[in-house]
From Swiss-Prot:
Protein species of origin: Shewanella sp. (strain MR-4)
Name this polypeptide is given: Sulfite reductase [NADPH] flavoprotein alpha-component
Pfam family, one: NAD_binding_1
Recorded metabolic or biological pathway in which this protein acts: Sulfur metabolism; hydrogen sulfide biosynthesis; hydrogen sulfide from sulfite (NADPH route): step 1/1
EC numbers for this chain: 1.8.1.2
Enzyme class: oxidoreductase
Length: 604
């Protein structure tokens, strides 16, 4: 029966091949058929060419759940992959792909579409979702009256444009006539429970609309990042690594504490590419936890339940709960618990909340806004109020071509002062305080959107002020190992030359050896008027434009809030002044570079 259906569908097999397949399968028992099925699936997966399959026919599309993900980090990919596996287990035929690898012309043939998408920057689509996002917003987007869909949006509520890209997809699909299986699901940084519930709900919603095909399941995973060779060590199962070095690399007179951290990956087998990030799990500072407990009058040894585990309240606050990053929901909840008129008024103003959380931590709420008498905040209610601790991502500052089983980071200690009280970033303080031999739980977070050119002859322009220089240290190590002959140009900036020139001797050695073609620096406080990297870009605009015309790849790493925007504006100015482009054409020019992977950003 199945082979008869195969010959009538848009099969990639010729009729003689179908006949041969019939002859072979007729001679096999059930066990042998199962073995052949697995063998063929593995062979197809290993070929790496699944993305090139011809579009499915309408008959096939009606039997297929298409799951697309767009995510700057691996969170969206992980959620989508887990959903695909659950759908497969229930007998559904599944097409799983990154939005960046999806053929938008296939959209009008889809009948069941499940999207997982994050939001990047100020409400922007992540890199691999940009094309689909633009297509749906364009006049080319078709009517989708036959489509049922659901969107899971990932975001961080501490940012203004929370889950904006997911909202965009949901609104646009609805406007094009598609029918929502479920209301839009918006997930904060503690997304696991909500994502798991969405898995269950959306598969239940899909069930009446599709026939299961348990014997013919095609999991078309077009992402190499989901290969079977993935490390066993993940965000959920990190590797316990050893800290080898945590060395301050800013001068004694610097107002910044930046550390060069070296971590031993030992025999973990963890591999990373230059451009990837390292996920770091950390523990909250014990002194900070003691301050919070004292402020709330709660006993440290009180038993609480976290993720079905009974532990002491103090252990929960040190190991399990987020204390150093506020978010709007917590500010609003604390305003109600404290009944503070000041905090209640502030919590209703999004911009005021956004500014407040930049310079306050949970301990500041406890210290400055006392609970009202009937708040009844006991130990278990406290741990329910606080969201789970999440790892921090750091751009990797090394290449395994040079450091082998080590991984290097460039970590700026996050430090703020409020009413005379110093507050530190959770992960940065943990790493800065780590002594040689200390244990840290880590995993590799791939970043396929920040990669060196495949051809080592290609010139590269690297713009990385402050700790944004980290991945470019890795780039240079990799280029030297490759014997790259392509030119390389670094723009670096920090407050002071004598105190803040990160990895100065390494850059000088690269210049001396001819591995680094040129470096332009901007030390903002070494003269009366402030000079930043964007000023150096403008000064060197003619040369920079010539490099771009010669095929250079352009990279930016560092602060997304100000630096990346200012640098982008400077680049637009270069295109206008030295390329003779209009403002609109300049934007289109850099958008074309981005789509060809010649303009890449790692900003945060």
């Amino acid at each position: 029966m199945l082979l008869k259906e195969l010959s009538s569908l848009a099969s990639p097999l010729s009729q003689p091949q179908v006949e041969k397949l019939k002859q072979l399968t007729a001679e096999l028992n059930a066990v042998q058929l199962a073995w052949v099925s697995g063998y063929l699936a593995a062979t197809a997966n290993a070929s790496g060419n699944l993305a090139q399959l011809a579009p499915v026919s309408d008959a096939q599309a009606a039997q297929t759940v298409t799951i697309l993900y767009g995510s700057q980090t691996g969170n969206g990919r992980g959620i989508a992959k887990a959903l695909a596996e659950k759908a497969k287990a229930q007998g559904y035929s599944v097409n799983l792909a990154s939005m960046g690898e999806y053929n938008v012309r296939q959209l009008k043939q889809e009948t069941l579409l499940l999207l997982v998408v994050s939001t990047h920057g100020e409400g922007e689509a992540p890199d691999d979702a940009i094309e689909l996002h633009k297509f749906l917003a364009s006049k080319r987007a078709p009517q989708l009256n036959n489509l049922h869909y659901s969107v899971l949006a990932l975001g961080d509520s501490s940012y203004e444009f929370f889950c904006q890209t997911g909202k965009d997809f949901d609104a646009r699909l609805s406007a094009l006539g598609a029918k929502a299986l479920l209301p839009l699901v918006e997930c904060d940084v503690d997304y696991e429970a909500a994502a798991g519930q969405w898995h269950a709900d959306v598969l239940s919603a899909v069930k009446p609309l599709i026939q299961t095909t348990a014997n013919v399941v095609a999991l078309n995973d077009t992402s190499s990042a989901l290969a079977a060779s993935e490390s066993e060590f993940t965000k959920q199962n990190p590797y316990s690594a050893e800290v080898l070095v945590s060395q301050k690399i800013t001068g004694r007179g610097s107002d910044r504490d930046v550390r060069h951290v070296e971590i031993d990956l030992g025999e973990s087998g963890l591999r990373y590419e230059v451009g990837d990030a390292l996920g770091v799990w950390f523990s909250n500072n014990e002194t900070l936890v003691d301050e919070i407990l004292a402020g709330l009058g709660l006993a440290a040894d009180t038993k609480v339940t976290v993720a079905n585990e009974s532990i002491s309240l103090k252990q929960a606050l040190i190991e399990k709960k987020e204390l150093t990053q506020l978010y709007p929901g917590l500010v609003k909840a604390w305003a109600e618990l404290s009944a503070s008129p000041e905090l209640l008024a502030l919590s209703e103003d999004k911009e005021q909340v956004r500014q407040f959380i930049l310079h306050h931590q949970f301990a500041d709420l406890v210290a400055n806004y006392q609970l009202k008498a009937d708040a009844n905040l006991d130990a278990n209610k406290l741990v329910e109020l606080l969201r789970p601790l999440t790892p921090r991502l750091y751009s990797i500052a090394s290449s395994q071509s040079e450091v082998d089983t080590e991984v290097h980071l460039t970590v700026a200690l996050v430090e703020d002062e409020h009413q005379g009280q110093a507050r530190f970033g959770g992960a940065s303080h943990f790493l800065a305080s780590a002594e040689e031999g200390a244990e840290v739980k880590v995993y590799v977070e791939p970043n396929k959107h920040f990669r060196l050119p495949e051809d080592p002859q290609t010139p590269v322009i690297m713009i990385g002020p402050g700790t944004g220089v980290a991945p470019f240290r890795a780039f240079m190590q990799e280029r030297v190992a490759q014997g790259a002959e392509g030119d390389s140009w670094l723009f670096f900036g920090n407050p002071h030359f004598e105190q803040d020139f990160l990895y100065q001797t390494e850059w000088q050695q690269y210049l001396k050896n001819g591995d680094l073609t040129r470096i332009d620096v901007a030390f903002s406080r070494d003269q009366a008027h402030k000079i930043y990297v964007q000023h150096r870009i403008k000064e060197q605009g003619q040369t920079l434009w010539q490099w771009l015309q010669n095929g250079a790849h352009l990279y930016i790493c560092g602060d997304a809030e100000r630096m990346a925007k200012d640098v982008h504006q400077a680049l637009l100015g270069v295109a206008v002044e030295f390329g003779g482009l209009s403002s609109e054409a300049a934007e289109e020019y850099f958008e074309t570079l981005r789509s060809h992977k010649r303009y890449q950003k790692d900003v945060y």
